[in-house]
């Protein structure tokens, strides 16, 4: 019992000594803190900081200005311009859907009025399309494809500039006759080559059938047929690489026809540049001939 009392008394004394030391530490710090507080709150040359804070009128302090970002907008004239452009494109789209090359002026006005919404804007749109060259208005007829009119006028001007008894017409007739004979001969040669190819394939098929059912067996002919088919595919691939043409019967015919046509023209001394020049001069809608490559 005596030992327990001694230990308990010792613990109580230690606790009391710790609390006393803490209070003495804060007592030592408090005068220093008060001194710092007075130093910041008072000013030797004017009113102290407390009076300044109390004298501030909060309602007189204006809030910070907000930065307003400029808003990009369209003016009335720009809006009208965009609306007019939209209406014009809408009218052009309606005109492109018409399969005919020309319509009456009344139908043209109706299309413009339906696209624009009223008669006044439709009339203005029709005049704008006429002035811009999108259509050609001649009397009561409106031509929807001005480029065709331009080509026709160009051909007519060329024809009127040519004399009725121009000797170049005879030259064009001779060149056209020579070209026609060259085309006929080239076509005949190519058709003969294609018939030879058909005969070769028929003989090859008959030979493989005889070897399969009479001479040999399918076990022997199966790899042979596979390799022959592969060789045909390789030949078609080489044809495509050299000519950039699809390896079909039509592509083969066209390519062989161009090759034979070129050789025959060189043999007969045919001037294809002169032929194109005269053809465009004396023909209303010329079809230019391209030299075979």
UniProtKB/Swiss-Prot annotation:
This is Calcium uniporter protein 5, mitochondrial. Belongs to the MCU (TC 1.A.77) family. InterPro entries: MCU_C (IPR006769), MCU_fam (IPR039055). It comes from Arabidopsis thaliana. It is a multi-pass membrane protein. Residues 1-5 form a transit peptide. A motif (Selectivity filter) lies at residues 218-226. The chain crosses the membrane at residues 189-209, 220-240. It comes from the Eukaryota. GO terms for biological process: mitochondrial calcium ion homeostasis.
